[in-house]
Curated annotation (Swiss-Prot):
NCBIfam families xref list: yfcH
Family per record: Belongs to the NAD(P)-dependent epimerase/dehydratase family. SDR39U1 subfamily.
Pfam family, one: DUF1731
InterPro entries: DUF1731, Epimerase_deHydtase, NAD(P)-bd_dom_sf, SDR39U1
Superkingdom assignment: Bacteria
Name the record gives this protein: Epimerase family protein SSP1921
Disulfide bonds: none
């Protein structure tokens, strides 16, 4: 019976992941920042903001590191530090935990983001592309992945998932994107030509477990649907599924003034495809945006 250790296990992605894992013959320990009790016999919580939390962790086979402050807040100077440190410090704490243990994890799955890649209207990015940090978000991703790769020195297989925009009803981008359409105000953002590399949350959870269970899977994987859309087409598809018009336009300048540096998530984007996932014979349930939105939008 495998024992999973999950950070970020109470968040949008982590909650769905826990539901999927617990259907198999597995135990789960979830690291949290507050005291929690479990009603499930195979799920336990450890508050790792308390002293000596390490003593409560049993032998672990698989580590899934999803910890990190949300990007969906205004990026003030202090909050940017929170975004960075919440990821770096959590990953370092995990490494130090297992560095001092005889029983090492077989696999580490570490979350990351497509913000690693430079914004480009014309380039299609695969996992083969390598670059150095060029803005705040890419610096966060670069440092986070660097910390995760330390686990390779323990003999642990490391899988890094660069997540695209995760579509879910329970949080993330979709509820915020749908809100203007609910009020008949949806439309083009900026040029509308920027790419939205997205993935349905069910496919993300399935792909994550697929890479964990595929022994040949290691290194970086792009967690995006194979069919990427421009923002204008994304919005048009969302409008059709929502039975609302797609007719307004918000200039780039207005978005940058309203969101500050966080506007890069909306305007400065990349076309990212999941070559390595598909090479491992992973089959998407929602490869097409319309199918994904029809499942999520009610």
């Amino acid at each position: 019976m495998k024992h999973y250790l999950i950070t970020g296990g109470t968040g949008m992605i982590g909650s769905q992941l826990v539901k999927a894992i617990i259907q198999s013959d597995a135990h789960i320990t979830i690291l949290t920042r507050q005291d929690m009790t479990s009603s499930h016999p195979k799920i336990s919580y450890v508050n790792w903001s308390q002293p000596n939390w390490e003593n409560e962790i049993p032998d672990i086979d698989i580590v899934i590191n999803l910890a990190g402050a949300s990007l969906n807040k205004r990026w003030t100077k202090s909050y940017k530090q929170t975004i960075m440190l919440s990821r770096i410090q959590a990953t370092q704490a995990l490494f130090e935990l297992f560095q001092n243990r005889k029983h090492k994890p077989e696999v580490l799955f570490n979350a990351s983001a497509v913000g690693y890649y430079k914004p480009d209207l014309y380039r299609t990015y695969t996992e083969l592309y390598k670059t150095l940090p060029f803005d705040f978000l890419s610096e966060v991703v670069y440092q986070w992945e660097r910390m995760a790769r330390q686990f390779e020195t323990l003999g642990t297989r490391v899988v890094i998932g660069r997540f695209g925009m995760v579509l879910s009803n329970d949080g993330g981008a979709l509820p915020m994107m749908k809100l203007p359409y609910d009020f008949y105000l949806g439309g083009k953002l900026g040029s509308g030509r920027q790419w939205y590399s997205w993935i349905h949350i069910d496919d993300l959870v399935r792909a994550l477990l697929h890479t964990i269970n595929t022994e040949s899977a290691r290194g970086v994987f792009n967690f995006t649907a194979p069919i990427v859309e421009h923002q204008n087409m994304f919005g048009y598809t969302l409008a059709r599924v929502s039975h609302r018009p797609h007719h307004t336009w918000v200039p780039s300048l207005a978005i940058r003034l309203a969101l500050g540096q966080m506007s890069t998530v909306v305007l400065d984007t990349q076309k990212v495809i999941p070559n390595k996932l598909q090479a491992t014979h992973f089959k998407f349930k929602y490869p097409d945006l319309k199918i994904a939105l029809e499942d999520l939008v009610h």
